[in-house]
Design a protein with these regions (language model features):
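Hydrophobic face of amphipathic alpha-helices that form TPR/SEL1-like repeat modules
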Residues: 1-37, 62
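Residue-level signal for inorganic ion chemistry
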Residues: 38, 76, 98, 178, ...
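Conserved C-terminal structural/oligomerization subdomain of aldehyde/semialdehyde dehydrogenase
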Residues: 39-42, 268, 323, 372-377, ...
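Short, well-ordered beta-strand elements within core beta-sheets of diverse protein domains
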Residues: 41-47, 64-68, 156, 267-271, ...
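Rossmann-like NAD(P) dinucleotide-binding subdomain of oxidoreductase/dehydrogenase enzymes
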Residues: 132-278, 412
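A short hydrophobic/small-residue beta-strand
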Residues: 180-182, 360, 452
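ALDH superfamily catalytic-core signature
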Residues: 240-392, 455
Length: 497
């Protein structure tokens, strides 16, 4: 399918503050560059501290106005469900904006990014009027009500790898709970958040309840994190920046902070795995989907020695089907990395691995691409890589998050060794185990240090299940009622009878 002209996408490029699109206070802009071909899609408002302050003040006024915070929860739900319907109605526009801004294959942008984001708003729209308070046990002369109320102003800072989905994960529960939000999208992929602000207004969200301040982290993200009138920061991104937000909170008003900071997720394949072909295909999808730019990507395989050679052979064959191709082609399954700079960062990890003596089992080359087009000149493309690091589990390529299409394999002597290798990381986001013994799988899942453990599968999820981790993967959860509760606080009302 041909790429639609940019003019037909009706891009929004200004900040969204207090219900209106406005330029940055100082008039500055930055280029939104497509990783597909390096083309400049638009000049976007480059917000700074003054713009963030305007947005926070607009959010606070809207929250105190209380037409959203104290509205019937069912009314808030109707607005969120209306937004979900608008997103589905504007599927092509949103999908193309996301594909061109991130390098996601257009088929994935349609079927995953837009649909899952719309479903997230619809889910919280349905859930919000089904959350009940409590009555505490008291003597007969008192009534103690325990209820939840919104926090106030939430600052949401989202990354570039899944900008629409992760924005929905933050916005939907925060808005459902009755908060006002200031959203700072990543400077590498700001466009879908601005379109979403337009659709939210059309859906009936009151002015000031959602504000969007595109810009660079140190110019817009830090002022948001330090602002004394922000009640919570919800951040997804890197470990170093997440730690900064903890510092910003401590140095300002002690605001709540939830962090999702990435991972180095292991897939543990045991000798009794029922279907090595299914495991190999799932492993390939688990790391090479979105060119490996997924926080919980299954970037490490730990396999028992008895089946190691066969699994490596099957996994390499599966990797060959992921050939870099034009994200605008409907047949593409493996698009671009977010930028040439990020591609160079991934390549730096690979160069270091070569210097460290790692064995490269597969490093691109010809494969069956299913008829997808060739990569576009000027784009940020990279082939899949499979590395065996069984001889040195301490290599940086095994321990550090690469955030690219790079899979490492380690061979384990037995189950205990496999668990030792799987847990030899500072992260704790996700893991998988492949075995035909469900009882064994249950025992292993308890020993894997991860917020989510899949058994005989990978990256299967639902809005009903929480997502998040521990240690360097952060704390707090997206999705599910657990996320909804994290955007509210408990209040006790004691009534003397």
């Amino acid at each position: 399918m041909p790429v639609p002209p940019i003019s037909e996408l009706n891009l929004r490029t200004e900040a969204f503050i207090g219900g209106s699109f406005v330029p940055a206070a100082d008039g500055r802009t930055f280029d939104a560059v497509s990783p597909r071909d390096g083309a400049v899609l638009a000049q976007v408002a480059r917000c700074g501290a003054e713009d963030v302050d305007r947005a926070v003040k607009a959010a606070r006024r809207a929250f105190e106005r209380a037409d959203w915070a104290l509205a019937d929860p069912a009314q808030r739900g109707r607005v969120l469900k209306r937004l979900a319907r608008l997103m589905r109605a504007k599927l092509e526009r949103l999908a193309w904006v996301e594909a061109l801004d991130t390098g996601h294959p257009i088929a994935n942008a349609r079927a995953v990014d837009v649909i899952n984001s719309a479903n997230c708003f619809a889910w919280y729209g349905e859930a919000i009027d089904k959350v009940y308070g409590e009555i505490a046990p008291t003597a007969a002369d008192a009534l103690a009500l325990i209820d939840r109320e919104p926090l106030g102003v939430v600052g949401a800072v989202v990354p570039w790898n899944y900008p629409l989905i992760i924005t929905a994960w933050k916005l939907a529960p925060a808005l459902a709970a009755g908060n006002a939000v200031v959203l700072k999208p990543a400077e590498q992929s700001p466009l879908s958040a601005l379109v979403l602000a337009e659709l939210a207004t059309e859906a009936g969200l009151p002015e000031g309840i959602l504000n969007v301040v595109p810009g660079y982290g140190e110019e817009a993200g830090e002022p948001l994190g330090r602002h004394p009138d922000v009640d919570k920061i919800a951040f997804t991104g890197s470990v170093p920046i997440g730690r900064r937000f903890l510092s910003y909170a401590g140095e300002s008003n002690g605001k709540a902070v939830s962090l999702e900071l990435g991972g180095k997720s292991p897939q543990v394949v045991l000798a009794d795995a029922a279907d090595l072909q299914a495991a190999a295909e799932s492993i390939a999808w688990g790391i090479f989907y979105n060119a490996g730019q997924t926080c919980h990507a299954g970037s490490r395989v730990v396999v028992e020695q008895a089946v190691a050679d066969e699994l490596k052979e099957r996994t390499i064959a599966a990797a060959r089907t992921f050939v870099p191709a034009d994200p605008a082609d409907d047949d593409t399954i493996f698009g671009a990395l977010i930028s040439a700079e990020h591609r160079d960062s991934v390549d730096g990890h690979l160069q270091r691995a070569r210097q460290d003596g790692a064995q490269f089992l597969y490093d691109g080359g010809a494969g069956d691409d299913g008829g997808a087009a060739e990569p576009v000149p000027g784009g940020a493309y990279m082939s899949p890589v499979v590395i065996d690091s069984s001889d040195d589990p301490a290599r940086a390529i095994v321990r550090e998050e690469v955030f690219g299409p790079v899979l490492t394999v380690q061979v384990a002597r037995d189950l205990d060794h496999a668990l030792e290798l799987a847990n030899a990381t500072s992260y704790g986001l996700a893991a998988a185990v492949w075995t035909r013994d469900v009882s064994k799988a249950g025992r292993i899942a308890r020993r894997l240090r991860a917020g989510t453990v899949w058994v005989n599968s990978f990256d299967i999820s639902s809005m009903t299940t929480p997502f998040g981790g521990s240690r360097d993967s952060g704390h707090g959860r997206d999705r599910s009622l657990h996320a909804l509760h994290s955007y509210s606080q408990l209040k006790t009302t004691w009534i003397a009878l």
